[in-house]
Amino acid sequence: RPMSYHPNMTQRPSQALALATLLIAMPAFASDELQRQQPDTIIFAMMSGKCRTFKVGGRDLPCRAVAFSQTEEGRANFTIAINDPKDDSHIITFSGDNGRRPDANVYELPIDRMLLKSKDRPKADGLPVPAIEPATGLCRQVGNFVTLELTSISCTAVDRNGKSYELQYQSDGTPMAVRRIKRKRVGSPAVSPFDDVK
């Protein structure tokens, strides 16, 4: 069936705004390398629901939305838009490579870095460039990837400074909004949670 990246009309205005923020502010994979060519994003997906838990360094943070994205090179991200009235660019991303599908209804992504974006970061093309913190962890996405009716996303990671990151996100039952962009490169594509979606 056709896929759409537009939030449906039943979504709350805050979710629609968060989706727009995430679409515009996709993570840029660079710190000091602002001039490096960035890999193209080929999949963007957003779940409608709520954060049951989102903690950074043991501190609870309110989140507006959670999105999944994947680049042509295979790197995947779970990006959280934080509900911060003082900073609409406050975004934290669990980023990793070599995602896997241990069974049909589970996608696991080993995390090797956290991307931390805020209004105080240096900018490229007018958007904040995230700070990159090497980390170890895992994200797990559960649900029916064919119908896009996902159940939950859970992520845990610890960066090199010992700071912990934890996400527990629960779907409200609305099918995910997915945007798929045609690959430009040849070769075998990386494993995606949406490989079965046509």
Locate predicted features.
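Edge beta-strand at a domain terminus
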Residues: G96, G137, S152-V197
